[in-house]
């Protein structure tokens, strides 16, 4: 699937495949976490991003999203309020969270924002419960494809436990 986007000067069209857009989005959301220079958040977020595809394959997209909200102690309504305040691209979620920089909530927001842009504008945990199987399957495949990109960038850009000392011996 190709998408035509205008370049920054809005004069020529740039063709980007869905895979390119996934990679671009993944880069920006991982960079947002890296730019905080919060080692603890980076470690926790990187670990969670690596585990998320397996969680989705084992438990399903709905249960994984519900798990992320439960661990963040956040309601779907609160998460939707945060998502509704994001009106820029690339999205800047961390500034919308204030002091509540939880890796679970952040990953939920990153996944759901992407799904809203590429599957259905109204997607969240509640709406996925009432969707037909084909839409849930589509959303699941999109989430896993996105997380594969995010995992690659997380490994490259985020601090991980033990990673800093690997090259010093």
Curated annotation (Swiss-Prot):
Subunit structure of this chain's protein: Monomer in isolation. Part of the type III-B Cmr ribonucleoprotein (RNP) complex, an elongated RNP with Cmr2 and Cmr3 as the base, with Cmr4 and Cmr5 forming a helical core along the mature crRNA (39 or 45 nt in length), while the complex is capped by Cmr6 and Cmr1. The 5' end of the crRNA is bound to Cmr2 and Cmr3, while Cmr6 and a Cmr1 subunit (Cmr1-1 or Cmr1-2) cap the 3' end of the crRNA.
Role, per record: CRISPR (clustered regularly interspaced short palindromic repeat), is an adaptive immune system that provides protection against mobile genetic elements (viruses, transposable elements and conjugative plasmids). CRISPR clusters contain sequences complementary to antecedent mobile elements and target invading nucleic acids. CRISPR clusters are transcribed and processed into CRISPR RNA (crRNA), formerly called psiRNA (prokaryotic silencing) in this organism.
InterPro entries assigned: AF1862-like_dom_sf, CRISPR-assoc_prot_Cmr5
Family: Belongs to the CRISPR system Cmr5 family.
Keywords (A to Z) from UniProt: Antiviral defense, Cytoplasm
Example of a GO cellular component annotation carried by this entry: cytoplasm
The protein's name in its UniProt record: CRISPR system Cmr subunit Cmr5
Annotated organism of origin: Pyrococcus furiosus (strain ATCC 43587 / DSM 3638 / JCM 8422 / Vc1)
Gene for this chain: cmr5
Subcellular location: Cytoplasm
Organism domain of life: Archaea
GO biological process: defense response to virus
Taxonomic path: Archaea, Methanobacteriati, Methanobacteriota, Thermococci, Thermococcales
Cysteine disulfide partners in this protein: none
Entry keyword Kinase: no
């Amino acid at each position: 699937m190709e998408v035509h986007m205008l370049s920054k000067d809005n004069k020529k069209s740039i063709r980007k495949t869905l895979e390119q857009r996934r990679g671009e989005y993944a880069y920006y959301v991982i960079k947002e976490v890296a730019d905080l220079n919060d080692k603890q958040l980076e470690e926790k977020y990187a670990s969670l991003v690596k585990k998320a595809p397996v969680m989705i394959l084992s438990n399903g997209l709905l249960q994984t999203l519900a798990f992320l909200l439960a661990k963040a102690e956040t309601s779907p309504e609160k998460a939707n309020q945060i998502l509704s305040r994001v009106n820029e691209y690339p999205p800047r979620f961390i500034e919308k969270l204030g002091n509540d920089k939880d890796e679970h909530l952040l990953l939920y927001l990153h996944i759901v924002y992407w799904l809203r842009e590429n599957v259905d504008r109204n997607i969240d945990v509640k709406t996925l419960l009432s969707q037909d199987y084909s839409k849930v399957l589509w959303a699941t495949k999109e989430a896993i494809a996105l997380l594969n990109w995010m995992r690659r960038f997380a490994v490259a850009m985020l601090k991980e436990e033990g990673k800093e000392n690997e090259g010093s011996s």
